[in-house]
């Protein structure tokens, strides 16, 4: 009889530990999901911030028309940072491809891109306003670049 009580107590302890572990697993999964969502949103916020910075830098150059190299390099830097952050967001593959192509055009074809700065600024503003036409405008700009030129 004594042995039976000990086994019953051990069984209840095992059940209690199993339930506690199950609850802990659910809590961990919930916290992980919440943190993942926050991190994703922070990446998107940084992406949009860098896109805004690039558009602001283009606007500064268009307004003053001085020190092109400085403003162009700042735009390159901001576009590179935006590219890096959008890479970290899973379901932004099409947007990532579009931004990568625009950044590539800025790197490889600076002479051609100088003539398209106003269009790029408008497209980037549309992107930060969450308008899909901004990505379409960027695609049009990228397609209009002569890949055989400079």
Residues covered by each model-derived region:
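Transmembrane signal-anchor/signal-peptide helices with a preference for the extracytoplasmic
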Residues: 22-45
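Short, charged/polar, low-complexity loop and linker segments
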Residues: 27-35, 53, 57-60, 122
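C-terminal amphipathic alpha-helix
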Residues: 110-150
